[in-house]
C-alpha cells in the first residue's frame, strides 16, 4: 500500500484537532453515594438495623435450639450477642446502616422470587449479614472474622458479593418496587494498588 505524505499528515492533524480541540475534559464524579433507605417512623437507621438483626439472630438461635433455659447455651448465646453488638457498633460508626438495610431488602426480594444465590466473600464473616439473611454462613460456627469484611479503622466500603440468577429480572423488580429514578445498574472501575495502601 502506498501512502501519500500529505494524506498521513492531514490525518494526524485532524486526529489531533478532534482529540484536543473538540473534546471536553471529563473527570468522572467519584463521590460515593450510599443508598438512602427509608426506615419506619420512630426509628433511625441504626436503631432499625439493630432491631432487624436482633430479631434475625433470635430466630436463628431458636432454630438451633439455643435458649437461655439451657446452661450450656448461655455462654454461646452471650458470644453471639456480643459479636452482634460489636458489628452493629462498627457499622453505625462507619455510617453503613442504610447500606445493610438496603441489602436486606434486596435479599428478601430475591428470596421471595427465588433468584438468590449465596452471599459470598468476606461478607460471610458478618453476623449482622447472617442475621439479616444476606448470607447463609454462620460466622461464629466457622470462625470467620468480621474484621476481614469491615473494620472501624479502615477507609474502604463494605462490599457484599451477592449473586442472583438473573440480574436484569431483579433490576426490573426493584424498579417496580422503588422507582426507576432510584435503581440503576452500576459498573466497577477496577484499579490495582497495594493492599496496605
Sequence positions of predicted segments:
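Phosphodiester-processing cores and adjacent nucleic acid-binding clamps
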Residues: 1-197
Amino acid at each position: 500500500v502506498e501512502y501519500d505524505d500529505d494524506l498521513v499528515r492531514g490525518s494526524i492533524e485532524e486526529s489531533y484537532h478532534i482529540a484536543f480541540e473538540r473534546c471536553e475534559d471529563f473527570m468522572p464524579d467519584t463521590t460515593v453515594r450510599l443508598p438512602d433507605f427509608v426506615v419506619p417512623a420512630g426509628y433511625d437507621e441504626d436503631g432499625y438495623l439493630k432491631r432487624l438483626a436482633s430479631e434475625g439472630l433470635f430466630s436463628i438461635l431458636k432454630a438451633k435450639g439455643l435458649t437461655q433455659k439451657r446452661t450450656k447455651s448461655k455462654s454461646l448465646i452471650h458470644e453471639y450477642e456480643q459479636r452482634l453488638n460489636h458489628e452493629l457498633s462498627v457499622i453505625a460508626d462507619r455510617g453503613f446502616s442504610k447500606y445493610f438495610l438496603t441489602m436486606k431488602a434486596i435479599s428478601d426480594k430475591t428470596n421471595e422470587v427465588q433468584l438468590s444465590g449465596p452471599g459470598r466473600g468476606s461478607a460471610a464473616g458478618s453476623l449482622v449479614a447472617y442475621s439479616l439473611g444476606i448470607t447463609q454462613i454462620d460466622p461464629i460456627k466457622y470462625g470467620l472474622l468480621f474484621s476481614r469484611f469491615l473494620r472501624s479503622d479502615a477507609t474502604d466500603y463494605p462490599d457484599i458479593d451477592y449473586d442472583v440468577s438473573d440480574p436484569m429480572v431483579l433490576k426490573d423488580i426493584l424498579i417496580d418496587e422503588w422507582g426507576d429514578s432510584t435503581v440503576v445498574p452500576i459498573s466497577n472501575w477496577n484499579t490495582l494498588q497495594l493492599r496496605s495502601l
